[in-house]
């Protein structure tokens, strides 16, 4: 489903763009979609776009992660149907699965100050403000990315930027499969 949007990222308003609601997808399908939209955005053929979806169970390994950070054995992963993907985003390892809302903003930062760290903080701020609407006291932890409720991470963040256009984003645990 595609909708126009006008939203706030931190204290900044995204003037206009598209919101794609993509249902549940394999990670590699969503990654290919991100790459395609990012390329179109870099070429200024489309406006800023935000993709919302869920993934089938998988681990993604960012630039600072490694397979050795996966605690489950190959047999368990296979039996549970959990795939593993290496990615070009920042961060370590992240589990994705049903019950987790994933948001992939594909935004040209040239119109927003070209500050990647501020962008990352702004994405966290959107989640923090959203949690507040549900009376959940979420916040940041010094030295740790993402959004936290106490000592528990409720949203994992990992991004990459190419030609000032963002990819990847943030994954919010709404009602994830706790057995994973």
Model segments located where?
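N-terminal lobe of the biotin/lipoate ligase/transferase fold
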Residues: 1-149, 153-154
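Short, conserved beta-strand/beta-arch hydrophobic-aromatic motifs that form part
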Residues: 68-73, 154-179
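Hydrophobic transmembrane alpha-helix bundles
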Residues: 81-92, 168-180
């Amino acid at each position: 489903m595609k909708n126009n949007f006008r939203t706030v990222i931190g204290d900044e308003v995204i003037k206009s763009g598209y919101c794609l609601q993509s249902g549940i997808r394999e990670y590699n399908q969503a990654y290919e979609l991100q790459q395609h939209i990012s390329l179109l955005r870099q070429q200024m053929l489309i406006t800023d776009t935000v993709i919302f979806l869920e993934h089938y169970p998988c681990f993604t390994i960012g630039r600072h992660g490694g397979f050795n950070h996966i605690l489950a054995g190959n047999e368990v992963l296979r039996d549970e149907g959990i795939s593993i993907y290496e990615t070009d985003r920042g961060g370590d390892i992240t589990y994705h699965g049903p019950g987790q809302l994933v948001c992939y903003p594909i935004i040209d930062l040239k119109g927003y100050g070209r500050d990647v760290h501020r962008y990352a903080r702004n994405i966290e701020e959107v989640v923090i403000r959203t949690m507040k609407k549900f009376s959940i006291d979420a916040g940041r932890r010094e030295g740790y990315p993402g959004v936290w409720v106490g000592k528990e991470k409720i949203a994992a963040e990992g991004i990459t930027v190419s030609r000032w256009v963002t990819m990847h984003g943030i994954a919010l645990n709404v009602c994830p499969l706790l057995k994973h």
